């Protein structure tokens, strides 16, 4: 009986230590959940989820967008995956999509209800993905800065989204 009690205490102590090292995801936690993009379905439909995975050690965003056929252009689907993680004290993210892109981001939360993902400096264009809390929903934007103007981000996509019920 004592050995069973000892095993239980060791397990409990290990579980408490694991819980203590799970990131709080402060500033990002409001994104966790299932979201549906709002807008004109004739332009496309989509949605995304943010979820804790690997015991809460990472956040994973899964995103999709379905675009209808337009003229000679066939319908298409865009899928992407982003893993958000801690690297020392820094929050980082890696993004992959169905078009073959891979983007490394630094992540910041400059204000409550605001998250910015800014791509690492590289020889090519830089990217900025932003989320802003708007009451129960959010506004999102994706911006691109050309190689010769590294901080001059221009809008590429913008959207609003609501939590799925």
Residue ranges: model-predicted function:
Residues 3-15:
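Bacterial N-terminal signal peptides
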Residues 19-165:
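Hydrophobic small-molecule pocket/channel-lining residues, especially in calycin-type beta-barrels
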Residues 2-3, 22:
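Hydrophobic alpha-helical segments and their boundary regions
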């Amino acid at each position: 009986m004592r050995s069973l009690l000892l095993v239980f205490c060791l397990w409990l102590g290990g579980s408490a230590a694991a819980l203590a090292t799970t990131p709080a995801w402060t500033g990002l936690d409001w994104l966790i959940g299932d979201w549906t993009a709002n807008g004109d379905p004739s332009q496309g439909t989509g949605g995304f989820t943010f979820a804790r995975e690997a015991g809460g050690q990472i956040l994973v965003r899964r995103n999709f967008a379905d675009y209808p056929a337009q003229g000679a252009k066939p319908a298409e689907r865009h899928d992407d995956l982003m893993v958000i993680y801690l690297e020392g004290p820094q929050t980082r993210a890696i993004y992959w999509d169905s078009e073959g892109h891979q983007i490394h981001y630094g992540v910041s939360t400059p204000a409550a209800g605001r998250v910015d993902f800014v791509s690492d400096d590289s020889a090519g264009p830089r990217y900025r993905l932003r989320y802003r809390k708007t009451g129960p929903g959010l506004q999102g934007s994706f911006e691109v800065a050309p190689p010769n103007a590294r901080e001059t981000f221009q809008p590429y996509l913008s959207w609003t989204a609501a939590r799925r019920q």
